[in-house]
Amino acid sequence: MPPKGKSGSGKGGKGGAASGSDSADKKSQGPKGGGNAVKVRHILCEKHGKIMEAMEKLKSGMRFSEVATQYSEDKARQGGDLGWMTRGSMVGPFQEAAFALPVSGMDKPVFTDPPVKTKFGYHIIMVEGRK
């Protein structure tokens, strides 16, 4: 499959946030994840101990959305669903992790382990889609 967006002219009009802004091109080394947007869920905890409790629940087979609802301190408690996020709209470590993860589903989630540390706290991230 050929790489997308090499000159910026092949962008579709659907992705409102991404269209017209070529600022994402400044990181033209292109992380191996590919695509310009990911559908992301996360669990955010300020304290390391709490995020590790959440990690244990995930590893024991509890659904990602349930763990997010129970543990995440993010204001938007929709099972951790952040929706579609474009390159440049996330903080550095979160973005790197999100674009490095494979797409997975609730039945067999692939998530960041260990959690990712940002200025907001600790995140467990999973990716449900890529475009």
UniProtKB/Swiss-Prot annotation:
Database matches in InterPro entries: PIN4, PPIase_dom_sf, PPIase_PpiC
Subcellular location, record wording: Nucleus, Nucleolus; Cytoplasm, Cytoskeleton, Spindle; Cytoplasm
Upper classification of the organism: Eukaryota, Metazoa, Chordata, Craniata, Vertebrata
Composition bias type Gly residues, residue spans: 7-18
Ranges where the record places region Disordered: 1-39
EC number annotated for this UniProt entry: 5.2.1.8
The protein's name in its UniProt record: Peptidyl-prolyl cis-trans isomerase NIMA-interacting 4
Segments for region (Necessary for association with the pre-rRNP complexes): 1-41
